Amino acid sequence: MKIVYDRINNMRGNLITITAEGVSLGELARIDLKDGRNIYASVLRIDGDQVTLQVFQTTRGISTSDQVTFLNRQMQAVYGDTLLGRRLSGTGLPIDGGPQVIGESIDIGSTSFNPVKRIVPRDMVRTNIPMIDVFNCLVKSQKIPIFSVPGEPYNALLMRIANQTDADVVIIGGMGLTFKEYQAFIENAETAGTINKTVMFIHRATDPAVECLLVPDMALACAERFATDGKNVLVLLTDMTAFADAIKEIAITMDQVPSNRGYPGSLYSDLASRYEKAVSIEDSGSITVIGVTTMPGDDVTHPVPDNTGYITEGQFYLHHGKIDPFGSLSRLKQLVIGKVTRDDHGDLANAMIRLYAESKKARERQAMGFKLSKWDEKLLTYSHLFEERMMNLEVNYTLEEALDLGWETLAECFLASEVGIKESVISKYWPEIAQISK
């Protein structure tokens, strides 16, 4: 039997407080309004018999005499094949004008996957973006952020990854999206023809902050079920800074003592519990997580990117519309380079980055008016070709095509003896291009 409480003691923002007993943290409750509407909330804090709930929509229209019924279960998402191609809110309700999703109800916010059933990552997630596939490979079950400043095309990068990836299912979790950004994701999926393998959980900027907190949990709960059913799932989250700001907003409303720049002390755990859902499951599928983290003022010491860096396995830095090869790092790339990719992959990638770093110095000498040597001229030519062919996010090359293009670029600019690659690799892969004016 469910006990009905008919007295709300306090309302602050999206939080309400009632006197109740026998409830658990995270338990779902239904608020029955006088006008016949039902609003849902979940238990956020328990202090003796004082229970604080966060309302998923808005407290507007709620009176202190409305009835509150605890449902003896956690917040749930609906999982099933009918989920593919759908757009849902942070609470799991359809926002695409379609019918209710039919399927199995699954709890959200559960613990990470059983470590005993995890396996060491050994497969690559292909994105057909050279700056990722060639230089910082994305590995199945990897968790990695995209560090960026507001205004950079990070959502466009996520869309291109979603379009070009070889993952079986793509789940997009949008937090704090403007209407324009939301529409861009919809139009991209429809235009690229990936809508039938895509699921979107969307929190728009005008939606309550409480719903923002649910988006990653909804996305990752469904991803976990797809993965246990043998699917390789790619989860794209944007923007985790908006998620952290929603946590801060709720914490301030609850009068919690802030830890760093207004964020609560639980920020690290809140982020880690989401990113740790990334997994490769033995004899089954995988979950790979890419999360956009915007850095206010391009400050990497901001609490959100700072904490994220300790949790994740590398990062992609997005600067001036390109993935920065010097700030970006994939800590798992050594698990696949030369093992599941071509044997020239590691040598070629290292040589190209080293020469591009040297070309930066040549550009500085050119900018300061120094006389340039013939080697400097070669480096400047190479720098232009590298940025045009490898750093352009609009390209769509398979890994093998990108590696071949890398060899062609080196051969157009340098002699084989100048690139610093061992002779056994050079003799096998150096293209037959006439050595003119080198």
Swiss-Prot record:
- What name appears for this protein in its UniProt entry? V-type ATP synthase beta chain
Q: Name one GO biological process term.
A: proton motive force-driven plasma membrane ATP synthesis
- Record keywords: Ion transport included? yes
Organism of origin: Protochlamydia amoebophila (strain UWE25)
Entry's Pfam families?
Answer: ATP-synt_ab, ATP-synt_ab_N, ATP-synt_VA_C
What does the function comment of this entry state? Produces ATP from ADP in the presence of a proton gradient across the membrane. The V-type beta chain is a regulatory subunit.
Annotated GO MF terms = ATP binding; proton-transporting ATP synthase activity, rotational mechanism
Name of the gene encoding the protein in the UniProt record: atpB
The organism sits in which domain of life? Bacteria
Record keywords: ATP synthesis, Hydrogen ion transport, Ion transport, Transport
CDD domains linked to this entry? V_A-ATPase_B
Which family, according to UniProt? Belongs to the ATPase alpha/beta chains family.
